[in-house]
Curated annotation (Swiss-Prot):
Gene this protein is translated from: PEX6
Quaternary structure (record): Interacts with PEX1; forming the PEX1-PEX6 AAA ATPase complex, which is composed of a heterohexamer formed by a trimer of PEX1-PEX6 dimers.
Amino-acid positions noted as binding ATP in the UniProt annotation, renumbered to this chain: 759-766
Family: Belongs to the AAA ATPase family.
Coiled-coil regions listed: none
Protein name, as recorded: Peroxisomal ATPase PEX6
Keywords: ATP-binding, Cytoplasm, Hydrolase, Membrane, Nucleotide-binding, Peroxisome, Peroxisome biogenesis
Cellular component terms per the entry's GO annotation: ATPase complex; cytosol; peroxisomal membrane; transporter complex
Primary location: cytoplasm
């Protein structure tokens, strides 16, 4: 059974360079190991160290709360004493570890035995442990441990891999080990200063609540600050004392100051407060003054330094939540819960957030039968916030007035009126602090986000009174690319509210009802300016007519509505997945159009970084903060997920988390440990491994490839292609150069992105295209001619555009046109009345021209044809399919043997098999497909021969059993009890190949081969 999890305890660690264990005082040892286990282990957390594993022992000479250990190889810390948190763990055995050795030491330390021998002085003899990231003797470093980051080393079980250290730039995480704050190693006088003078401190926001000795029901959590204990000594106060703070403009507040919980890496001379208080203070530097000569400590309430207000007025900050009547019950209950149990310290102008669950609140507000649900449930899992602002205290609206205490038993609380104050921008982490989902940050990789940010700032700034009438249409060819999300994120960064109006929800029984609903929603939104109004799915109410080109009757009236609600400090935005369906009259009303495509590789990299960013976590493993193992590359994840949308990437990370949990659950069953211990051994996080991601991405590909057209990377390597060494070199020169050296093509030099394979059928043209995609980790699109044809005018050309757009979305990508002569024949020679083939060729030419310009980088077009003489001449001009490679029939027996070796890589060949002898019997008219048929037939012959031999053995066995008076046996019984390894495994013999060769006829005749050689002479001779 897994061991019981133990609660952590605090202690003081003394650095001991010679210790191989973590030695504990008798008191600490008894607290952690009262049951006296045979092999005690402990993990400790300290500033800059996250749960390092050590074997534990008892040292009776140490003081009560003291322990000692050698931590140089864990963190390289120079500190002699440090506060730590100790935790008993039951470690697992490390199955595999990778250790890198400096190049100067590699000649003497290049085997696992030599490395282990060199590490003996550093490892405990009885219970050696190894930790990922450890800097070992002689400059060795532990790069990777499996299945967790640290654990026991067991002889015969733990496998050690030794690799030479690469001479590279120092990684950022290793550089961080030596980038310490020098103040951390200065000596502080830990006694409280006798003089209680004011001190200037910086202010910084917290990302999560910090527990204190005081209950939130007793003390105002929005009037707390946290500093390092050394800073408290400098101020001359105790933890829990009440101090006064003053900003540069003279505004004063009281603050209860606590010591930041140890261990921590927070900065000195910085006071950390809640993001709400940080915004309300409004200054990054404050003057902190202790309250008089006496300490106002934990036992003292705030009313000992603040008087209670007689009356306080709150105004709703206009926004989507405070103007929605269905949420009134929710935020009124939240206000009551905020003020009733606790005395709150407030000033005029302070913002007060009331978080709540909008889905549950709307259900309660709209359905009377749900009124029995307790209102406390509204704050359990919040997703929205209603903001309020203190507008008056004791009748004074002066922001410079003093701070008061709101006591529900003495203070009259009035909620009324509205204000259009801007809310707190998301640069201050208030969403994380309140437990809301964080909005993604759109960095420099998202160029369209900068454009939207400029539009939001201009339309909602002080210039908005000039009636700029700013409007923007965001459109995309695929759903779920983040049109509404980028608007929410950018507006939140600017502290601006967003009103989202779904046009599907506006559609009524008639035009008047639809327009009336729209006007009502716009009236509510425009009353909250400055804000952003988003009309989602605009094409649903502003459709272009499909018949005569005339707009529907509602369109002209909708134009008037949009004109009436332009300007006034509001950015009018609309989103659409198909802008071509929107009426031109409506579309022309939008001054800006921004296309948002499927995320590119750099954008996917940033999305994955956001999704895998470790948060504060929670109590259960499903809420534990996540981290990436050192061998997980975000760049590789971005490459493998080409063509996927942000919701798909989110699903991948969620699936990966579940797979990691399943992996740890299985590990707990196989070992005597708990999930809590496994998280501790992974430095307190749920660590995601490459195998977790591979399975999740494979699932996403399999599930969504058909519905969203996500291309896949094929699994065909050069080993599967034989006899094409010369062609391989030309391909590498054409494709590898722009991928490895893209900066060479940034100065106007056009790259060659089109390759045309031509030659007899069955020579491996399709196989070679897949090998290209696999070799360079490119996604692969295969396009067949009939897939592009459509009966409607213009749709065939649109299909060509969509193919190339998908390729650009999934780059780096290979677009493979099989049987290109059926897709792009010579123009003017077709008999179709509509000229559809000519238009397809023209569209294909236009798209190929775009591949060598901006936006086409990373997209390579490969065509294959048996009849290059039927292709349109324009396709073969420079910038299109200008690299023509002839894939012919092997003209030597050595090349034929190479092809057969590639085809039989996974065969079990008998000792008598000679591929050289077989190839010498083959004529020079055999294509690659013929050799594939030869090898397949040989395998089939071997299977038939083996099956006949098995049948003969079973027949003989049953005959003997019948003579002995026993029942005959079945084939299944024979395979379970009598079959040998040779009966189960099929081995291909020389006779199988010879039989297949004798029965095979070439697919290309000598006359046809001469025809293809003439074509080669025509194109390679006349086109050079």
């Amino acid at each position: 059974m897994p061991s019981i999890s133990h609660k952590p305890i605090t202690a003081k660690l003394v650095a001991a360079p010679d210790a191989t264990k973590l030695e504990l005082s008798s008191y600490l040892y008894q607290q952690l190991f009262s049951d006296k286990p045979a092999e005690p282990y402990v993990a400790f957390e300290a500033p800059g160290i996250k749960w390092a594993l050590y074997p534990a022992s008892e040292d009776r000479s140490l003081p009560q709360y003291t322990c000692k250990a050698d931590i140089r190889h864990v963190a390289g810390s120079l500190k002699k004493f440090m506060p730590v948190v100790l935790k008993r763990v039951n470690p697992v055995t490390i199955e595999h570890a990778i250790v890198t050795v400096p190049a100067s030491q590699y000649e003497t330390l290049n085997t696992p035995e030599q490395v282990l021998k060199a590490l003996e002085p550093q490892l405990d003899k009885d219970r050696p442990v190894i930790r990922q990231g450890d800097v070992l003797l002689n400059g060795c470093r532990v790069r990777l441990c499996e299945p967790v980051n640290q654990g026991k080393v067991v002889k015969g079980t733990t496998k050690l891999t030794v690799a030479k250290e690469q001479e590279t730039i120092q990684p950022a995480d290793e550089a961080a080990d030596v980038a310490f704050d020098i103040a951390e190693f200065l000596d502080f006088d830990t006694s409280v200063a006798k003089t209680r003078e004011s001190t200037n401190l910086q202010v910084a926001p917290l990302e999560g609540a910090i527990p204190t000795p005081l209950s939130d029901r007793f003390d105002d959590c929005e009037s707390r600050g946290f500093v390092k204990s050394e800073t408290m000594s400098k101020l001359g106060v105790f933890s829990g004392d009440i101090v006064s703070i003053k900003t540069k403009n003279g505004a004063e507040r009281v603050l209860r100051l606590f010591a930041y919980p140890e261990p921590n890496t927070v900065k000195y001379d910085v006071v950390y407060v809640s993001p709400i208080l940080y915004h309300n203070i409004g200054d990054k530097e404050i003057e902190v003054t202790p309250n008089g000569e006496t300490h106002k400590s934990v036992g003292e309430a705030l009313d000992s330094v603040l008087e209670a207000a007689e009356e306080v007025k709150l105004a709703r900050v206009l926004g989507p939540t405070t103007t929605d009547r269905t949420f009134q019950t929710a935020y009124h209950a939240g206000l009551q819960a905020y003020f009733k149990p606790v005395k709150r310290a407030v000033r005029v102008g302070d913002l007060i957030p009331i978080p709540f669950d909008s889905i549950l609140a709307r259900t309660i507000g709209e359905d009377p039968e749900m009124s029995h649900i307790p209102l406390e449930a509204l704050a359990v899992k919040p997703d929205s916030v209603a903001w309020f602002q203190v507008t008056s205290l004791n009748g004074s609206e002066d922001p410079a007035s003093k701070q008061y205490l709101v006591d529900s038993s003495q203070t009259k609380l009035i909620e009324g009126g509205t204000t259009s104050s801007a809310v707190i921008p998301t640069s201050v982490p208030w969403r994380e602090y309140l437990g809301l989902d964080t909005l993604p940050k759109f960095g420099s990789e998202f160029a369209y986000a900068d454009k939207i940010r400029n539009l939001v700032q201009i339309s909602t700034s002080a210039l908005s009174h000039a009636k700029l009438n700013t409007s923007v249409l965001l459109h995309s060819a695929k759903r779920g690319v983040g049109k509404s999300t980028v608007l929410r994120s950018v507006a939140a960064q600017c502290g601006i509210s967003v009103f989202e109006i779904s046009c599907f929800g506006l559609i009524g029984d008639n035009e008047a009802q639809t327009l009336g609903t729209l006007r009502a929603k716009l009236d509510r939104a425009y009353g909250c300016s400055p804000c952003v109004v988003v009309l989602q799915h605009l094409e649903s109410i502003a459709k272009k007519s499909d018949q005569d080109g005339k707009d529907e009757g509602i369109v002209s009236k909708l134009v008037d509505v949009l004109a009436d609600y332009s300007g006034h400090g509001v950015l009018l935005a609309a989103t659409s997945n198909d802008p071509d369906k929107i009426s031109e009259a409506i579309r022309s009303r939008f001054q800006f159009e921004i296309e948002i495509g499927v995320p590119s590789e750099p954008q996917r990299r940033q999305i994955f970084s956001h999704l895998t960013k470790s948060g504060p976590g929670g109590d259960s493993i499903r809420n534990a903060p996540i981290s990436l193992r050192s061998d997980v590359s975000v760049e590789n994840l971005a490459l493998q997920s080409a063509g996927l949308t942000p919701p798909d990437l989110t699903a991948i990370v969620q699936t990966t988390r579940l797979r990691a949990i399943d992996r740890l659950n299985k590990l707990t069953k196989d070992s005597d440990t708990t999930l809590d211990d496994l998280l501790t051994l992974s430095h307190g996080t749920l660590q995601l491994t490459p195998s977790d991601f591979d399975d999740a991405i494979a699932d996403a590909r399999q599930k969504y490839s058909d519905s969203i057209g996500a291309p896949r990377i094929p699994n065909v390597g050069w080993d599967d292609v034989g006899g094409m060494e010369g062609v391989k070199k030309d391909i590498l020169d054409t494709i590898e150069t722009p991928l490895k050296y893209p900066h060479w093509f940034s100065d106007g030099v056009k790259k060659r992105s089109g390759i045309l394979f031509y030659g007899p059928p069955g020579t491996g043209k399709t196989l070679l295209a897949k090998a290209i995609a696999t070799t360079f980790s490119l996604n692969f699109f295969s396009v067949k001619g009939p897939e592009l044809l459509n009966m409607y005018i213009g749709e065939s050309e649109a299909n060509v555009r969509r193919v190339f757009q998908k390729a650009r979305d999934a780059k780096p990508c290979v677009v493979f046109f099989d049987e290109l002569d059926s897709v792009a024949p010579q123009r003017g020679n077709q008999g179709d009345s509509g000229g559809v083939m000519d238009r397809i060729v023209s569209q294909l030419l236009a798209e190929l021209d775009g591949m060598s310009t901006a936006g086409g980088e990373g997209v390579f077009v490969v065509g294959a044809t048996n009849r290059p003489d039927l292709l349109d001449e324009a396709l073969l001009r420079p910038g299109r399919f200008d690299k023509m490679l002839y894939l012919g029939i092997s003209d030597t027996h050595e090349k034929q043997q190479t092809i057969m070796e590639a085809l039989t890589r996974k065969f079990r060949l008998a000792a008598d098999v000679s591929l050289e002898a077989i190839s010498k019997r083959c004529p020079f008219t055999f294509t690659g497909a013929d050799f594939y048929a030869l090898c397949s037939d040989a395998m089939l012959n071997a299977m038939t021969r083996t099956a006949n031999e098995v049948d003969a053995k079973i027949k003989l066995l049953n005959k003997n059993r019948e003579e002995a008076g026993e029942e005959p046996v079945s084939i299944r019984w024979w395979f379970d009890h009598e079959a040998t390894k040779s009966d189960i495994e099929v081995e291909v013999a020389q006779q199988d190949f010879e039989k297949a060769k004798d029965e095979l006829s070439p697919s290309v005749s000598a006359e046809e081969l001469q025809h293809y050689l003439k074509l080669r002479q025509q194109f390679e001779g006349g086109k050079k």
